[in-house]
Structures are given as structure tokens and as C-alpha cells.
Amino acid sequence: MPLQLPKLIFGATTLGNLFVARSDQEKHDLIAQWFRHSELPVVIDSAGKYGAGLSLQVIGRELQSLGVAASDVIISNKLGWRRVPLRSPEPTFEPGAWIDIDHDAVQDISRDGILRCWQEGNELLGQYRASLLSVHDPDEYLAAAIDSDDRRRRLDDIVAAYQTLADLRDQGEATAIGVGAKDWRTIRELNQYCDFDWVMMANSFTIMNHPQELVLFIDQLASQDVAIINSALMHGGFLTGGDYCDYRPLDPAVAADAKKLKWRSDYFAACRDLDVDPFDVAVAFGLSHPAIRSVALSTSRPDRVEALVASVNRQFPVAVWDALKQRGLIDTDYRITAG
């Protein structure tokens, strides 16, 4: 039986001061709203990379402050980065991304390195433990290879790291191990070497982008009883009107970028005509494949949490999907019965 997770998983990048330094009170209020509007247990997705461990530290501190029982929360910790002293004006690992943090971070992906990351995560979480473990962004780690030999070495590092995670699972230190990546093809490659309980796909299966090849891979994962979490459904805020798509600004002079901008304009117009909310429709599409049980959504605003919870339960009639297909916004070969 696949891992059982709720429809909504809360992303915790904002707790690590992604792009904006939030106050302790704002972070406290945000976490409080997660528990106010959700059924238990609440699932939180974090990583040692988020604010060089700050996100994990805040989670442990605020859960304790709120008196949350360990049985009422499930924490996912994506491993592969650990904190080190900050010896420069700003962090070196993602300059400009993490604001007002007191540590830097280094990558440490290997059989022993992933254990060090796990141990640090436990220390930062205090009395809580992460029960869902994974290697953080293995696609980016592989993409940094300078040649084929280096890529083979990096692949060996990742597989060795997963051997450590499998050992932790066998020892009862973790409930399940998985993988998260922006490039779903990396997940498919690693699936040949690793025994995953769950996968998290980012910027991959969305209303704007849902290639048939990926749909077939999702079918394959379902046949293996692998739980699937869909994330980054809005392409980094692009589908809510942001200037960035998949974390980079778009240039209308570039044909591929112009195509995405036109798609969004047409999508917004269609949603207006159909009197539906573009965000809610995008979330519903992200859950439309029967094998996808959960989506990971993030907000920095406590007053938006209730709307996120409502969005994962909102369904649309087949007529809405048919209308979007007729306008060329959804692949006509992709079948949606409801949702």
C-alpha cells in the first residue's frame, strides 16, 4: 500500500527567510494557522538548505511553543546541505536568496555526508524528528558534473546516500524515503537504483506543462505503489501573475518565453470567461491524475492558509476542462473525468 499522506503538504521555505526576512511572530502565526485549518497530522516539507537550517530550527521551536504533539506532525527533511559558519557578507550557497541568516551552507552528498545532514536536522528540530527523508535536488547535483566521469561519480554519491537512508528506514529512524526534483527525468533515472516510498515532482506536472511521457511515468510509479507529491504547481508564481517562471525572469523577445507568456494570458482570459479562479483550477489540475494524492503549497501569509486548504478540496465540472482543452490550454489527449 502506498504511503498515506493528506492532500495538502505545507512548504516551509519562508521559515528560512527566502527572499524576505520574516519576523518570529509572523512565522509563529503561519505555523499556528497550519494546525488551525488542517486535519491532523499536519505534514511540513523542509530542508537543511532552507536558510542554512533556519527553517528546521524555526519548525522545532514553534511546534514546541504551540504545544504540538509529535504524533500530530509529519516532517519531511530533504537532506544534502548542512550549515557552516558564515564568513562572508552573505551566504555563498545561493546568493541573494536567503535574507538575514546567520550561517552559510555546504553540500554534503555521500553515504556518510547524508548521515551528517540527518543528524544536524535532528539537532535543529529539537524534540521533533523528520520521518520522511530524501536527498535534496539530485537533478541539480548531477547537472553540475563537468564530464561523464564526474556525472558517474555524482550518481554513485546519490545512490550511496540513499543506501544510508534505506538503513535509517530499516532501523525505524524514518517512516519513508523518497526523492524530490525539478527534472522528473532524474527521478526516473534514480528509480532504477533506489527503492522509493514517495516522489515529489516540482515544476513538472502542471496545467501548463504535462507531457505524455511524464504521465506514463506517473502511471509506472503508481504500479509500484509509490506515493506521488506534486509541487511548484504555479511555476514559481508565474501562474499567479509573477514575473518569474521556474525561478527566472522571462524575456518576451525569446520565442520560448513569449509562448509561455501568451499561454498565461490565454489561461487567465479563459478562467475569467468560465468564472473560475486560475489558482484553484491549477491546483485541481495538479491533483487530476488519480495517482497523485498530495500537493505541496506554500504561502508566507498566515491569512492565506485557509484558502490553500480550501483549494485542494475544490472540484470543477468536466465542462471546465473541456473548455480549456478547446482553447488549446490542456493537452487534448490527457483525460480528466472530474476534479
Cite the ranges covered by each PLM segment.
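A solvent-exposed, charged loop/short amphipathic helix patch at secondary-structure junctions
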Residues: E94-H103, S148-R151
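Acidic (Asp/Glu)-rich catalytic clusters
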Residues: P2, R36, L63-A70, L125-Q127, ...
